[in-house]
Amino acid sequence: MEHFDASLSTYFKAFLGPRDTRVKGWFLLDNYIPTFVCSVIYLLIVWLGPKYMKNRQPFSCRGILQLYNLGLTLLSLYMFYELVTGVWEGKYNFFCQGTRSAGESDMKIIRVLWWYYFSKLIEFMDTFFFILRKNNHQITVLHVYHHATMLNIWWFVMNWVPCGHSYFGATLNSFIHVLMYSYYGLSSIPSMRPYLWWKKYITQGQLVQFVLTIIQTTCGVFWPCSFPLGWLFFQIGYMISLIALFTNFYIQTYNKKGASRRKDHLKGHQNGSVAAVNGHTNSFPSLENSVKPRKQRKD
């Protein structure tokens, strides 16, 4: 295993250059194998988990879900605050920021971004809860792609570009996750569900986040600094892939659902009644079908 790890390190160095020594010895960062193994285990659970649960009753997980979502909401809020203050204190340049130009503020950003990397490992639990609760329809290609790739990408980011221009996408994503995990936490409380009308706006916020990240990353291409250009091009490509997948998800989830509701609404009016609007069917059975003829008494 050590020989394999040494070979990987040699390959990475030849392809990406020397690692950033400021993160040497940090948990999970010296060796890529643990991150890779965690990702493989995640994909195996995604594949085998629904098969295991197929003939079993779903778990509620309500209590632990509330704690989990609260924990990630607070962690995301902490990361957002620390990144914003670190960028402000270091006087980061929006257009392009190198990885060794802000002294102690860079170290603050690095420490927070390590938590951001580690949070991507914690977020594997999103999928595991879907499996345990048998919400398999939520385990989409987008969901698995996003979760499986982010942990691996951020291992490389933390080893080669752990601060500087890397901060922007993580800052926006932390803010979006404050909203998202707050929503998930509240949705696990049945009495709160009727008031949670803003789910689609979280998806819109995610799309805006990706577009803004592309814009800010592109600034580093046109107004370059010491931040490596290769990383900027990679991030632009990755953001484009997420925009494509999230846009498809948004269309499938909201636009088609809205069109289906309008169609059902129109059909209901044509039949003289409104049958299915906003996902709810008419709670009153038709009089024609519900009134049964009385049997004649034999006495």
UniProtKB/Swiss-Prot annotation:
Residues annotated with N-acetylmethionine modification: M1
Keyword terms, alphabetized: Acetylation, Cell projection, Endoplasmic reticulum, Fatty acid biosynthesis, Fatty acid metabolism, Lipid biosynthesis, Lipid metabolism, Membrane, Transferase, Transmembrane, Transmembrane helix
GO molecular function: fatty acid elongase activity
Pathway(s) this gene product operates in, as recorded in its UniProt entry: Lipid metabolism; polyunsaturated fatty acid biosynthesis
Reaction(s) this enzyme catalyzes, per UniProt: a very-long-chain acyl-CoA + malonyl-CoA + H(+) = a very-long-chain 3-oxoacyl-CoA + CO2 + CoA; (6Z,9Z,12Z)-octadecatrienoyl-CoA + malonyl-CoA + H(+) = (8Z,11Z,14Z)-3-oxoeicosatrienoyl-CoA + CO2 + CoA; (9Z,12Z,15Z)-octadecatrienoyl-CoA + malonyl-CoA + H(+) = (11Z,14Z,17Z)-3-oxoeicosatrienoyl-CoA + CO2 + CoA; (9Z)-hexadecenoyl-CoA + malonyl-CoA + H(+) = 3-oxo-(11Z)-octadecenoyl-CoA + CO2 + CoA
Residue span of region Disordered: 274-299
TM region positions: 26-46, 64-84, 112-132, 139-158, 168-187, 205-225, 227-247
Biased composition (Polar residues): 279-289
Single biological process term from Gene Ontology: fatty acid derivative biosynthetic process
Taxonomic superkingdom: Eukaryota
Entry EC number(s): 2.3.1.199
InterPro entries (UniProt xref): ELO_fam, ELOVL5
Membrane topology designation: Multi-pass membrane protein
Record localization: Endoplasmic reticulum membrane; Cell projection, Dendrite
One of the record's GO cellular component terms: dendrite
Family: Belongs to the ELO family. ELOVL5 subfamily.
Assembly and oligomerization: Interacts with TECR.
Name recorded for this polypeptide: Very long chain fatty acid elongase 5
